[in-house]
Amino acid sequence: MKEDNKNKINRRDFFKLAGAGTLASAAALYGCSGNKNNGESESAALGEIPTDKMTYRTNPNTGERVSLLGYGCMRWPTRKRADGNGDEIDQEAVNDLIDYAIAHGVNYFDTSPAYVQGLSERATGIALKRHPREKFFLATKLSNFSPSTHSREESLAMYHRSFRDLQVDYIDYLLLHGIGMGGMEALRSRYLDNGMLDFLLKEREAGRIRNLGFSYHGDIEVFDYLLSRHDELKWDFVQIQLNYVDWRHAKEVNTRNTDAEYLYAELVKRNIPAVIMEPLLGGRLSRLNDHLMARLKQRRPQESVASWAFRFAGTFPDVLTVLSGMTYMEHLQDNLRTFSPLVPCTEEEFTLLEDTAQRMLQYPTVPCNDCKYCMPCPYGLDIPAILLHYNRCINEGNVPQNSQDENYREARRAFLIGYDRSVPRLRQANRCTGCGQCNPHCPQGIDIPAKLQEIDRFVEALKQETL
């Protein structure tokens, strides 16, 4: 197996590279096209996938060698239930994906009680139970977002349920989930005032938690506060959102976010390993427009567009693992090629990706990452599908500003036909009542009812031809 891939670029050189001056400015370009479901890969490259070339990073606290590609268990494949009443996880497909991943060197699996509408931990546990415990590292979270789960009793119940669903007697990596959502008030309610942080620290001492950390979204005050207590709490790792757009343009994507450049640097100062989420910015970095895609393809014609984003995230030397929610075998295979072994980005490639980020930001997409925390909607809306269709049409140039646009007829037809194909009519934006149940669950802080009502008004204007 390939040794840790840090020797090609040291930390000092890397920061010199990543922090070098103002990069090339960019002009506005249009479009990018959608892909299969979550867009985790543009296409699978040709050729055999090696089983012994995975790049590993060493956890400095434990000496464990962790695969640089980590499996995010947020997007397991689903199928219709036999009784027709909703969806269920396709366990056979999950088993196949996990078997293939382990056979090709992946050993880090990240789940949560909140994933796949509460079904992920159980499905992940069933699949991993078929493998020797020493073959994998399991990460899960205390996902007590809802005020009804903030009490010590409910939080403890969630924690112990994770052990049962995952069928393990210890957790390798346990995270305080989504700190920053709700600010300091939520942190105090979820983890401090109820004694849960103290409890988790004792669980780490007892060995039932091997590594304790947190994942961060939102309020930077909370991130800074928890890091300020590192000498006392000794965080073993921290999970952050990092990709070539969020590196320096996080606030341009979402005003409540903080640049990954800052987050990563703060972790490096304290020698805290970084686990990376959203390396594809919710799939958007695998759905570039034709022009941007062609620029990347010209450099590496045999590699997918998604591979550039994964290489960017994996190049940082203090990254322990890069998570990818791989729903389909083709996504898994493409990512395995990228990390077996990882080829770090060059200075020229960093410049190209910064330019790509600037060009992408010309288009006002909704910062939805398809996490599905907003689901299920009590009124049956498919919220992520609505927002993703809207984003896709923006990137493809199919959101006309008025009926005088040159391509108005084609864009109108593409938007409306695509809308009905992507979202069943009974689950479209016009069904939104504005109840707001979804809003507190969104880690990106989107005002979901307001955005759905905006999209519905746009759809009606297209139908009535009143733009």
Sequence positions of predicted segments:
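Active-site groove signature of glycoside hydrolases
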Residues: L166-A186
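Twin-arginine (Tat) signal peptide motif
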Residues: K6-F15, C374, C432-C438
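Beta/alpha (TIM)-barrel catalytic core signal, keyed to glycine-rich beta->alpha loops juxtaposed to Asp/Glu
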Residues: R12, L46, I179-L388, R392-F415, ...
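Conserved, mostly hydrophobic/aromatic
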Residues: N59, Y71, F109, T124, ...
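Short, acidic/polar
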Residues: D87-A101, S151-D165, I220-L227, A306-A309
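Acidic (Asp/Glu)-rich catalytic clusters
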Residues: N61-G63, G125-R133, F163-Q167, L227-L233, ...
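N-terminal binding-site loop/beta-alpha segment at the start of enzyme catalytic domains
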Residues: K2-F136, N194, F199, E205
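Short Fe-S-cluster ligation motifs
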Residues: N398-C432, Q464-L467
